[in-house]
Amino acid sequence: MIGEKKKCIGLIFGGHSNEHEVSISSAKTVFKAFKAQINRERFTVKAFYINKYGDWLDSDISEKILTGEIENYKTKKQEIFNQEKINFLDGIEFQNIDVWFPLLHGFNGEDGSIHGLIRFTKKPLVGCGIIGSALGMDKILMKTIFSNHKLPQVNYLVFQNEDLNDKQVKNKIINEILKKLKFPVFVKPSNSGSSLGISKVKNESEILLALEKAWGIDPRILIEEGLEVREIECGIIGNSKLITSEIGEVNYESDWYDYDSKYHSNNKIIIPAEIDSKITNEIKEIAIKSCRALNIFGFARVDFFLEKSSNKILLNEINTIPGFTKNSMFPMLWEASGLKIEQLVAKLVDISLDL
């Protein structure tokens, strides 16, 4: 707006989670959106890349990573600070940031870690707070709260900090799965995103390998009963008043919606999803209720299953920093709802300033 001081956006991306590359792709989209003509009078952007070792690189280098001038930059010569320094908030690069926009998918970012760090700057951030972020990242805690709020979910089991090197423990877990769930089942680490560490298990012989795969990421393991379902997603933005996007559906070619399906396949995206208006409204209501239950605001993507045989709505999970890649559903949902990506990022900043 003419005469109004431009807001400086601090875009944080990369990180040392296993979703590092996804974060870079998301940041490229958001960076480009802020640089678009429609946003030039309102915003400037400073990018801050965190490499896989946890080192923060300065904004000049970080911007070149986003524009493609530099690839796989790993030197520490241009860092603002590293893990041994604690006075990083005094750095001149941080002083002029008006709003932070973290795009760190996965642990040490999306789990509330970066939100806690940003709190020390006393500047607003795009997204929800520490508690909502932590709960949204932890599948076990999330599902426990959903259960307490009587929100519909698939049947599931939880195993926490079990010693998989102990044969008796392994047998106990397998027996409980056989007793309480029906195949196929999905074995998931509690703290992970983008379907990393998840396995679809079709019979007893596949359980152990799936448990070990999930255990390698997180010793807290969630096991869900697999059903014949449609993958449905809903975007959320807002603070005290949450607004829902159009409902979308993902049709994927693979056996299930795994990492490759999300980022490397030619999935068919249907927006709005071809479902009954009554079901659509119920999904939107549950999406808002689920975010309220976890104290999630700002923006999020809520994922659902719609059982094919019964049209039963089943809440899957909430993603508090959804992807902004070219294949990501969140920006597509909002574009179908009337907000192009350039308008969406500006709207998210406005929401953060309204808190």
Curated annotation (Swiss-Prot):
Binding site for Mg(2+) 1: D303, E317
GO molecular function: ATP binding; D-alanine-D-alanine ligase activity; metal ion binding
Cofactor: binding comment: Binds 2 magnesium or manganese ions per subunit.
Pathway assigned in UniProt: Cell wall biogenesis; peptidoglycan biosynthesis
Enzyme class per UniProt: ligase
Annotated positions binding Mg(2+) 2: E317, N319
GO cellular component: cytosol
Entries under InterPro entries matching the protein: ATP-grasp, ATP_grasp_subdomain_1, D-Ala_lig_Van_CS, D_ala_D_ala, Dala_Dala_lig_C, Dala_Dala_lig_N, PreATP-grasp_dom_sf
Subcellular location: Cytoplasm
Cofactor(s) demanded: Mg(2+); Mn(2+)
HAMAP family for the chain: Dala_Dala_lig (MF_00047)
Functional summary from the UniProt entry: Cell wall formation.
Record-given protein name: D-alanine--D-alanine ligase
